[in-house]
C-alpha cells in the first residue's frame, strides 16, 4: 500500500474510532487469535465431532429432530455441564412441558435454574433478549420455536389465517438479539420441530418451523435422531441416538456422533469413554475383557462402564487423553480435509442423480 493510501486509511480509522469508539474497526493481525470458548454437550463423541470440545459460546445453536428423539435431554445435559463450571442457565419453556424431576435426574441443579413459561412468542423472545443483555446468563434454552405463537394468533379465532407471522417474528427477534449474544458471550439454543413439505418430489420433504431466519443466524445446527432401542433382556431401557452436524461455522460440518440415552439417566457417557478409548488404543480389549494400563476394569462394556462410574478419576483421566488426542490442530485439519472430500462426493452423487 502506498503512503497516500496509508494516510487516508489512518485518517478514516481515526475518525471511526472517535465516532463509534475504540475497537469499532480492528486489524486482525494486531490481536492474538483466541480459541472459541465452548460448553460441553455431555456427550464426549459429540463434543469431539463439533471440533472445539462442545457448543460455542456467544453463538446461536439450533437443535431439531422428530418427537422423542432426545432434543430436550441433550439441552438439559448442556445445562448440567455448564452448571458444573459455575454457569448461570435459563430455560424459556414455551411448550410449558419442562419436568423438574427429570431435569434433576440428568444432573441439572434445578434450584439454580432460571425458568420462564411465557404466554406468547413475543414475550418469550423479549425475555430471552433481556436475559442476554443482562450479561449475567451463560446459557439460554428456548423450547421450542414451534411453540413461539404470535400474540395475534393467540387472540384470534381458531380458524383464522396468519400467513408468515411466526417467520416474521423470528426474523425480527434474531436480527435484534444476535449482536447482543456475541457481546454477552452467551450460548442460546433454540429447540425446533420437524414438519413435512407437501408435494416434494425430489430431496427431503422435511423442514423446520419458524421460517428460514434461524437457519442463517445459527452457527451450529444439529439434527438428532433415534436410531434404535437399548435393551436389558426384553426391557427397553434407552435409545440409540445419532446426531448429525448439518451446519458448523466454527469447525468442519457434516460430522456425526452416536451415543446412547438411558431413560431417567441421560447420556451414557461412560459407555462413550470405553468405546472411544478402545478406538484410540487407550483402553485394551481382549475378548470380552477391558483393561486400562494393564489393569482389568471389567468383563463386557457394561461392567467396564460401571467400573468408571465407581472410579470417576480414572474415567476423567481417559477422557482427558481422548480430548487431547482428538481435539488437536492436526486432528481438526484432517477432519476438515475429510469433510471437504465427503462434501465433494455428495455433490458428485447429487449431480449423477440429476438434482
Curated annotation (Swiss-Prot):
Name of the molecule in the record: Protein RecA
Gene designation per UniProt: recA
PANTHER family tied to this protein: MITOCHONDRIAL DNA REPAIR PROTEIN RECA HOMOLOG-RELATED, RECA
GO cellular component assignments: cytosol
Residue ranges of coiled coil: none
Predominant location category: cytoplasm
InterPro entries on file: AAA+_ATPase, DNA_recomb/repair_RecA, DNA_recomb/repair_RecA_CS, P-loop_NTPase, RecA-like_C, RecA-like_N, RecA_ATP-bd, RecA_C_sf
Entry-linked Gene3D superfamilies: P-loop containing nucleotide triphosphate hydrolases (3.40.50.300)
Stored Pfam families: RecA (PF00154), RecA_C (PF21096)
Localization: Cytoplasm
Keywords for the protein's UniProt record, in alphabetical order: ATP-binding, Cytoplasm, DNA damage, DNA recombination, DNA repair, DNA-binding, Nucleotide-binding, SOS response
Entry superkingdom: Bacteria
Residues that hold ATP according to the record: 65-72
Matching NCBIfam families: tigrfam_recA (TIGR02012)
Presence of the UniProt keyword Phosphoprotein in the record: no
Family, as annotated: Belongs to the RecA family.
Originating organism: Pseudomonas entomophila (strain L48)
Gene Ontology BP terms: DNA recombination; DNA repair; SOS response
Function: Can catalyze the hydrolysis of ATP in the presence of single-stranded DNA, the ATP-dependent uptake of single-stranded DNA by duplex DNA, and the ATP-dependent hybridization of homologous single-stranded DNAs. It interacts with LexA causing its activation and leading to its autocatalytic cleavage.
Amino acid at each position: 500500500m502506498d503512503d497516500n493510501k496509508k494516510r487516508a486509511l489512518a485518517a478514516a480509522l481515526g475518525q471511526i474510532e472517535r465516532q463509534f469508539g475504540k475497537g469499532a474497526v480492528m486489524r486482525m493481525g494486531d490481536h492474538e487469535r483466541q480459541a472459541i470458548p465452548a460448553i460441553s454437550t455431555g456427550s464426549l463423541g459429540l463434543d469431539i465431532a463439533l471440533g472445539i470440545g462442545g457448543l460455542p459460546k456467544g453463538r446461536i445453536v439450533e437443535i431439531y429432530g422428530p418427537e422423542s428423539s432426545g432434543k430436550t435431554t441433550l439441552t438439559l445435559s448442556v445445562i448440567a455441564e455448564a452448571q458444573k463450571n459455575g454457569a448461570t442457565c435459563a430455560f424459556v419453556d414455551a411448550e410449558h412441558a419442562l419436568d423438574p424431576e427429570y431435569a434433576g435426574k440428568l444432573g441439572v441443579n434445578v434450584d439454580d435454574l432460571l425458568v420462564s413459561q411465557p404466554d406468547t412468542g413475543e414475550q418469550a423472545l423479549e425475555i430471552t433478549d433481556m436475559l442476554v443483555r443482562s450479561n449475567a446468563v451463560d446459557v439460554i434454552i428456548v423450547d421450542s420455536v414451534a411453540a413461539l405463537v404470535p400474540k395475534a394468533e393467540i387472540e384470534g379465532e381458531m380458524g383464522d389465517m396468519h400467513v408468515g407471522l411466526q417467520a416474521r417474528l423470528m426474523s425480527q427477534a434474531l436480527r435484534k438479539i444476535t449482536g447482543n449474544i456475541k457481546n454477552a458471550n452467551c450460548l442460546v439454543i433454540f429447540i425446533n420441530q420437524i414438519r413435512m413439505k407437501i408435494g416434494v418430489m425430489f430431496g427431503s420433504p422435511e423442514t423446520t418451523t419458524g421460517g428460514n431466519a434461524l437457519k442463517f443466524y445459527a452457527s451450529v445446527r444439529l439434527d438428532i435422531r433415534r436410531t434404535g432401542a437399548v435393551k436389558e433382556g426384553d426391557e427397553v431401557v434407552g435409545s440409540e441416538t445419532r446426531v448429525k452436524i448439518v451446519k458448523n461455522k466454527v469447525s468442519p460440518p457434516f460430522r456425526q456422533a452416536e451415543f446412547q440415552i438411558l431413560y431417567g439417566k441421560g447420556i451414557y457417557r461412560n459407555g462413550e469413554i470405553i468405546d472411544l478409548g478402545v478406538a484410540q488404543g487407550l483402553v485394551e480389549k481382549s475378548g470380552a475383557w477391558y483393561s486400562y494400563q494393564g489393569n482389568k476394569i471389567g468383563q463386557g462394556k457394561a461392567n467396564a462402564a460401571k467400573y468408571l462410574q465407581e472410579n470417576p478419576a480414572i474415567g476423567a483421566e481417559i477422557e482427558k487423553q481422548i480430548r487431547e488426542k482428538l481435539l488437536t490442530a492436526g486432528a481438526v485439519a484432517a477432519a476438515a480435509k475429510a469433510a471437504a472430500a465427503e462434501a465433494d462426493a455428495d455433490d458428485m452423487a447429487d449431480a449423477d442423480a440429476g438434482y
